[in-house]
């Protein structure tokens, strides 16, 4: 009798534990696939592929914890913003590129506000939390389709992330852009790790009014402005990055505005046309720049 009672109790405990995540509102993790060969949950054909990717991202937004996996090798044609919602991961296989489509009307301008700086990757619905972007190449198509665009005029950003709490970007390459690779504003708890920015059109990482951002283990090849730009940032870290130039550009680290608790260390700045670190109209509290390697700058 005692064994039977213990067995019944054990079964009841197991059943209770299996229901706890749903009771507590836990996420159901799953992966849905987007492909270019017809084998995915959503299938693209190399033209206006943002339509199918956004369908997958819309499903993910309604099902927190979902990963949208872009299968490769394949180049996805992006003629509209990819809109990422909360608790969503956008990830790529090896050989995956999302590439700005040709012949698009102008996205953004020097006169546009940050919120109006339309980009290849943006936040769905005005705000989000716990967003991850991993393991893909973002190609801004500047030399291919938009050679007439003047670099640094706020046109065709690769990513504009506004009002996001909890953002991780890892293993992503941003290349051949017309303006910023990553413009992040009014956001918090941002991690940028092992990213490559190769010849974007303005800043590699532009953080404006951000609370908590780390940029690490990344490589920046400037051609228009700075590798990393902290403007009105609290709790910002830049460490173990390499910053250089393709023949133009500005600083490795550009500091502006009200800055509090900033650290830049372990970085390798070399062959930049100006000083490695530049301050423009800053008001600083606890800004520490130390143990960086600087060669042939400014």
How should these model regions be labeled?
Residues 25-55:
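Right-handed parallel beta-helix/beta-solenoid
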Residues 60:
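Hydrophobic pocket-lining residues that define ligand/cofactor binding sites across diverse proteins
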Residues 78-80, 94, 99-104, 142-148, ...:
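Short glycine/acidic-rich loop motifs that flank beta-strands on beta-rich extracellular proteins
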Residues 89-93, 128-133, 167-170, 189-193, ...:
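All-beta strand scaffolds that present successive hydrophobic residues in beta-strands
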Residues 104, 126-227:
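Right-handed parallel beta-helix
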Residues 64-110, 117, 138:
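N-terminal extracellular ligand-recognition/capping segment immediately after the signal peptide
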Residues 57, 121-125:
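Leucine-rich repeat
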Residues 1-26:
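Secretory targeting signatures
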């Amino acid at each position: 009798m005692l064994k039977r009672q213990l067995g019944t109790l054990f079964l009841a405990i197991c059943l209770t534990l299996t229901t706890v995540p749903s009771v507590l509102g836990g996420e159901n993790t799953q992966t849905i696939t987007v492909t270019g060969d017809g084998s995915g949950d959503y299938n693209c054909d190399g033209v206006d592929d943002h339509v199918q990717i956004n369908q997958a991202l819309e499903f993910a937004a309604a099902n927190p914890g979902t990963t949208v996996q872009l299968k490769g090798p394949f180049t996805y044609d992006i003629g509209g913003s990819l809109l990422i919602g909360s608790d969503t991961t956008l990830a790529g296989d090896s050989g995956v590129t999302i590439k700005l489509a040709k012949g698009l009307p102008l996205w953004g301008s020097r006169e546009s506000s940050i919120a109006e700086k339309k980009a290849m990757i943006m936040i769905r619905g005005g705000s989000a939390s716990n967003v991850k972007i991993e393991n893909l190449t973002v190609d801004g198509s500047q030399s291919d389709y938009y050679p007439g665009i003047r670099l640094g005029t706020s046109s065709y950003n690769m990513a504009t992330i506004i009002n996001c709490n909890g953002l991780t970007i890892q293993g992503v390459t941003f290349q051949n852009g017309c303006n910023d690779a990553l413009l992040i504003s009014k956001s918090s708890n941002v991690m940028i790790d092992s990213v490559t920015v190769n010849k974007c059109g303005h800043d590699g990482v532009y953080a404006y009014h951000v609370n908590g951002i780390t940029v690490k283990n990344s490589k920046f090849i400037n051609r228009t402005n700075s590798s990393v730009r902290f403007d009105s940032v609290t709790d910002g870290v830049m460490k173990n990055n390499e910053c250089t130039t393709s023949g133009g550009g500005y600083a490795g680290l550009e500091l502006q505005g009200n800055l509090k608790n900033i650290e830049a260390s372990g970085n390798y700045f070399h062959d930049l046309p100006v000083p490695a670190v530049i301050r423009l109209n800053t008001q600083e509290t606890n800004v520490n720049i130390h143990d960086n390697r600087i060669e042939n700058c400014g």
